[in-house]
């Protein structure tokens, strides 16, 4: 039977994403859901900027399987709702963004902030509290530089917090840099990668393929209470 513990590591442009990690400041070990490259067509060439790995808490499999077991990878990768269920599901997510090309913290944080604020204002949900959180988000990045191989690490928790950490040596640090208590930002960070307009289609494809396999081999009995739990969380 396939289980999260049987998830394998992945190599993306010589960036190795291990099969499991323990996020900074956390006691839980999360499994590798999927990984892929983020890039863009520039003057006819596909330029690769980062490799992205998305890790999930073990209980994500029974929770998602209650609704998505039996779907093919192709069906999942084309489902906005499936990725939305990952983003909003009541389990931890850990996103590792590792540089292929160098990037400054200021460049990265300003791009993410502009995207978040734009979406929130368009939906009429932007508040003063959100503005204060964005200021803190920009502050923690402003003096950082990320050479190739350096990583930005995000932990999205079901309680609505976003934990941010940095790694310059390829290792996952034990302590986090900052914890921001803002559910919208916590979800927006991972949604920017795997959501409807996510920046890494390759990561979405990897997630869909690996999770389809894990769910389809998961013990049916273990999913009995999963869908009601998802429903309680608005999924």
Swiss-Prot record:
Catalyzes the intramolecular cyclization of bicyclic chalcones into tricyclic (S)-flavanones. Responsible for the isomerization of 4,2',4',6'-tetrahydroxychalcone (also termed chalcone) into naringenin. Part of the biosynthetic pathway for all classes of flavonoids, a large class of secondary plant metabolites, many of which are brightly colored. Substrate binds at residues 50, 192. PANTHER family: CHALCONE--FLAVANONE ISOMERASE 1-RELATED, CHALCONE--FLAVONONE ISOMERASE 1-RELATED. The record marks 108 as: Important for catalytic activity. Keywords: Flavonoid biosynthesis, Isomerase. GO terms for biological process: flavonoid biosynthetic process. One of its GO terms (molecular function) is chalcone isomerase activity. Its EC number is 5.5.1.6. Belongs to the chalcone isomerase family. It comes from Chrysanthemum morifolium (Florist's daisy). Pathway: Secondary metabolite biosynthesis; flavonoid biosynthesis. Pfam families: Chalcone. It is an enzyme of class 5 (isomerase). InterPro entries: CFI, Chalcone_isomerase, Chalcone_isomerase_3-sand, Chalcone_isomerase_bundle_sf, Chalcone_isomerase_sf. This is Chalcone--flavanone isomerase 1. It catalyses: a chalcone = a flavanone. It comes from the Eukaryota.
